[in-house]
Regions:
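Amphipathic alpha-helical "coupling" segments that flank catalytic cores
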Residues: 1-187
Length: 187
């Protein structure tokens, strides 16, 4: 786009065209005739171009879901910023954490969810960690697909937390004296 007009051609190693593509769920080629309708054209095809609009959608959808269940999100601005950049059309969903993992320290649970999976932690009104997590899928709302997406994310989290549980239990089974003895052999 040069001076508000769509420019087609080639410059060095780049080809300039007058088309782009919709969200992967639509998988459609979109012809752009003028810049005035570019953003709306993308939104109509499930690509929210404006980062602030994507962020607002995530925040509003999150508030709606959590208020319904009287829950709170653990505030994590940097994770929100990261997730906003990972999705074109945010779909906020809530999954469940298997009860067996709730015995892990809060820091272990939240780190696994945040760092490895980009999931948000959820608490009750007293800030106790809930056996639920919130995540943002890159898809349109669809009850059947959302159900499968939630199930899939729950399975992935179960595997991650199983690993965390193994390492945590292994670590606490050793005393500091044991660890110090093992460290004597490290150069």
């Amino acid at each position: 786009i040069v001076k508000g007009k769509v420019k087609i051609g080639k410059d060095l190693f780049l080809n300039f065209t007058n088309f782009t593509f919709s969200h992967r769920h639509i998988d459609k080629k979109i012809i752009i005739n003028k810049i005035d309708n570019y953003e709306k054209l993308l939104e109509d095809n499930l690509v929210i171009l404006d980062r602030n609009k994507r962020s607002d959608k995530i925040i509003n959808d999150t508030s709606y879901l959590l208020n319904k269940e009287k829950l709170k999100l653990v505030n994590d601005k940097s994770l929100l910023d990261e997730v906003v950049g990972l999705v074109e059309f945010p779909n906020v969903l809530i999954g469940s954490i298997n009860a067996q993992f709730m015995k892990l320290p809060r820091e272990v649970l939240t780190t696994v969810m945040r760092v490895h999976q980009k999931y948000f932690s959820i608490t009750d009104k007293e800030n106790n960690l809930e056996a639920k997590f919130l995540f943002v899928a890159n898809s349109i709302k669809n009850k059947n697909r959302d159900f499968r997406v939630i199930e899939g994310n729950e399975r992935v989290l179960k595997a991650r937390l199983s690993d965390a549980c193994y390492f945590f239990e292994n670590d606490i089974s050793n005393t500091f004296e044991n660890w110090n003895e093992k460290l004597k052999h490290v150069l």
